[in-house]
Amino acid sequence: MKTTIILILLIHWVHSQIPISDNNTATLCLGHHAVANGTLVKTLTDDQTEVTNATELVQSTSTGKICNNPYRVLDGKNCTLIDAMLGDPHCDVFQYENWDLFVERSSAFSNCYPYDVPDYASLRSIVASSGTLEFMAEGFTWTGVTQNGRSSSCRRGSADSFFSRLNWLTKSESSYSTLNVTMPNNDNFDKLYIWGIHHPSTNNEQTKLYVQASGRVTVSTKRSQQTILPNIGSRPWVRGQSGRISIYWTIVKPGDVLVINSNGNLIAPRGYFKMRAGKSSIMRSDAPIDTCVFECITPNGSIPNDKPFQNVNKITYGKCPKYVKQSTLKLATGMRNVPEKRLRGIFGAIAGFIENGWEGMVDGWYGFRHQNSEGTGQAGDLKSTQAAIDQINGKLNRVIEKTNEKFHQIEKEFSEVEGRIQDLEKYVEDTKIDLWSYNAELLVALENQHTIDLTDAEMNKLFERTRRQLRENAEDMGNGCFKIYHKCDNACIESIRNGTYDHDIYRDEALNNRFQIKSVELKSGYKDWILWISFAISCFLICVVLLGFIMWACQKGNIRCNICI
């Protein structure tokens, strides 16, 4: 009988420790998308922030070929632009050509009388930006001299020849008349005249060609005047010649007049090049030209311009990304990544966004997971997902708009005497690149910080929206989950997700279940404290009883206590 009573009491105690059945409660967790391996990006506060997705902003590779669309790309082949302009015999195919971009090859060479251009870079740039070699011959009158001088160093076919756009004037019989020729510009566009002066290798050659011991060439307009004297002397032999020609150029504005005065050594113009204002350019490159479409061209080849930055080459043509030093800059296009924990306990408990993200979400960035009497489930929240996507969409385009300037960066050249200018130019360019590289990194960090903040904010908005619906019917578990204190089947869970949940319907049931569960939790929670207090009181009582027994025994003489000193 005693055994039966003890067994009944034990069963009753065990039953009292069992909480209310899970059929009468449910758990609802809120979370966000996560991936197993995220991408590290820079923000204002952290250089290594992991996000679910990011887009590379720096174009670091080229196609390896120059695309001939949408621009007219002219392959210079074996000719430089200046040789083609002067009319070098092996460059005759380029006469009257037009281009958006003239491509000079490293294999280009001159094959006529050796020459130099004192202001080579400026002339090359002017002709390149004009985008045409359109030439108009004019009827210059050269009296008292012999025209169309030729050289064995400049052969057209099997015959001696000369630059087709220049007229080499030499003595007529035994004299060289003083020349004074004028040519007005009665048109409404600028005219580019190319002329030169011949530097013989010896005095004998000078008098043999021009009679006078020293000639002179003066070319003037209303705005400028140039007087050049020949420098007679031997130079290194080039194509059988130790003499040289120096090439000069003059631009005549509408209404202005070109005046040429000379008594020898003149390399005269045959006409003018029509100047055009445009955005044509020139580039040195050995990349092959192919049929394809890219709007940005570099010496390495064409590159896409769908990114705001590139570090392929400083020299570009077309609609190109901004050159920066960094090889990579990643723009966050997803939220902060917190990979999901693989182990969730014996019973597969679910956790909310405060603990970790959720992998495998395919129907949204944010969503719900639940456990109820019908099992477990997961669904995305389209409203918060779309709100985040709308703010992130267009972010890349906005960055491109801020940085992708529609212009071409031409290469800059300087002669040796302009070395200090070249050093200054290089310093300025390097400083600009440093500044843009810093600005690019700061801009991306700002955008990344904004992206992470706004995605975190959408998660918090969803959590607050859910909490306001549930009110006292559920309790915040502190990990992004709610403990719902009433029976909540899948239809009930769906009403919470879509915002149609009516907490009044479940309020009484929730309050009743909450009271029962809390009382059990309270009893279970204070059990350890009660045990410790009981143990302490028991020990105290045992000590008191033991002390009393000792005192009683001493009084009766049953115990003797001897103290020796």
Curated annotation (Swiss-Prot):
Cellular component GO terms held in the UniProt record:
host cell plasma membrane; membrane; viral envelope; virion membrane
Point out the annotated site residues (description: Cleavage).
R344, G345
- Lipidation feature positions (S-palmitoyl cysteine): C554, C561, C564
Entry's localization field: Virion membrane; Host apical cell membrane
Q: Can you tell me which residues are glycosylated?
A: N23, N37, N53, N78, N180, N300, N498
Q: Which InterPro entries match?
A: Capsid_hemagglutn (IPR008980), Hemagglutn_HA1_a/b_dom_sf (IPR013828), Hemagglutn_influenz_A (IPR000149), Hemagglutn_influenz_A/B (IPR001364)
- Positions of transmembrane segments: 530-550
- Which of the residues are on side Extracellular? 17-529
Which BP terms does GO give this entry? clathrin-dependent endocytosis of virus by host cell; fusion of virus membrane with host endosome membrane; fusion of virus membrane with host plasma membrane; viral budding from plasma membrane; virion attachment to host cell
Q: Which UniProt keywords apply?
A: Clathrin- and caveolin-independent endocytosis of virus by host, Clathrin-mediated endocytosis of virus by host, Disulfide bond, Fusion of virus membrane with host endosomal membrane, Fusion of virus membrane with host membrane, Glycoprotein, Hemagglutinin, Host cell membrane, Host membrane, Host-virus interaction, Lipoprotein, Membrane, Palmitate, Signal, Transmembrane, Transmembrane helix, Viral attachment to host cell, Viral envelope protein, Viral penetration into host cytoplasm, Virion, Virus endocytosis by host, Virus entry into host cell
Family named by the database record: Belongs to the influenza viruses hemagglutinin family.
| Functional description taken from the UniProt entry | Binds to sialic acid-containing receptors on the cell surface, bringing about the attachment of the virus particle to the cell. This attachment induces virion internalization of about two third of the virus particles through clathrin-dependent endocytosis and about one third through a clathrin- and caveolin-independent pathway. Plays a major role in the determination of host range restriction and virulence. Class I viral fusion protein.
This protein is called what?
Hemagglutinin
Supply the gene name. HA
